[in-house]
Amino acid sequence: MLNLKTSAALFERAKKVIPGGVNSPVRAFNSVGGTPVFVTKGEGARMIDVDGNSYIDYVGSWGPFILGHSHPRVIEAIERTMKAHGTSFGAPTELEIELAELIIKVVPSVEMVRMVNSGTEATMSAIRLARGYTKREKIIKFEGCYHGHGDSFLIKAGSGALTLGAPSSPGVTEGTAKDTLNATYNDIESVRALVDSNKGNVAAIIIEAVGGNMGVVPSKKEFLVALRELCDKEGIVLIFDEVMTGFRVALGGAQEVYGITPDLTTMGKIIGGGLPVGAYGGKKEIMEHVSPVGTVYQAGTLSGNPLAMSAGLATIKILAEENPYPELEKKAVIIEEGFKSNLEKLGLNLCQTRVGSMSCLFFTDKEVVDFETANSSDTAKFATYFNSMLESGIYLACSQFEAMFISTMHTEEDLQKTIEANYNALKLAYGK
């Protein structure tokens, strides 16, 4: 039995001063039961908790650590900047320019970019910009797609809403909800119907080209092509939320994988190298509407702070120089094929999805293509599976509706241990 005595004590202490004992709801383990793991160190593909337990980590801080924890070049970049310059100035620095130039170089659709502090901030800002640019009010999002916790996005969102069993959040006003229209993922006719019934008043369509917060749900190529054509025809700003997929599924993100050019892109996670960073960028024609050159206001005390810029620069430089994507693909295939073999041995028919180094094992026999099919998953069986994996030293996202991330630091031994643990966990979950 896993010893989590210190974690349990810390959790009780935390609940007295932090709502639910955590600073992001899913971390409380409510959907899987048991004690949240309190972490003291991360190195490579492993995390160590406060009780000394070591885990092979497939969460990677919810996506940023494509290079693993504490990558030497990233740590060195942060330390160098902190010692030589400081932590933050609230004034421009050359590092901001360098990171912006690098992003523009590797993501061709981005002609200008603005740094913020989180993915939520990036998506909120992109929506405001689209509204200001088009002078329209409505936005279309997709059921199950999660774009952060901004009010406009907490209507039929994925991730936390699915994990906690709530379709939306109290505190979102009726007026805000009316301006957010929900379409069915991978269903272009549902989008056309909304556009037609709100003719001339749809400012933007925002989408995760790979839905990463209802599990991992890839878009169909023909769906994205039709979406691009519809936006062009109707003068709607197409926004790709690449907070999770940016620099993860390819250096140029999901838009590189699919060959689709959005008008605006939101980014986060990997571009901060583990520190809080978000960004939104796209066509110069649109971005020049952002204050101070334009009239669409957006600001931030710590936006573009040098520590985060240094970590992001180091991370993306490594990705651009070393091109680890073929290696990541090989590792992801090993996991995918290993899990598939286990399912066959146990006579189970579950849905596996994957794009690059992010994947999901859904506890349903349905093909998962949208919010409804993702929601058919057996979350009770997932909870049993999750806790068995944790006991085996495999740290997965504590929700059926999150991604499994592979890093450059996962070894062949790590992968084989994970496949073995997967077999035992599935066997337990299904009473085989």
From Swiss-Prot:
The record's listing under CDD domains reads:
OAT_like (cd00610)
Q: Name one GO molecular function term.
A: transaminase activity
Q: Which Pfam families match?
A: Aminotran_3
Catalyses: (S)-4-amino-5-oxopentanoate = 5-aminolevulinate
Q: Does the keyword Isomerase apply?
A: yes
List the GO biological process terms: chlorophyll biosynthetic process; protoporphyrinogen IX biosynthetic process
Subcellular location as annotated: Cytoplasm
Q: Which domain of life is it from?
A: Bacteria
- Tell me the protein family, please: Belongs to the class-III pyridoxal-phosphate-dependent aminotransferase family. HemL subfamily.
Q: How does it assemble?
A: Homodimer.
Protein name (record): Glutamate-1-semialdehyde 2,1-aminomutase
- Species of origin reads Chloroherpeton thalassium (strain ATCC 35110 / GB-78)
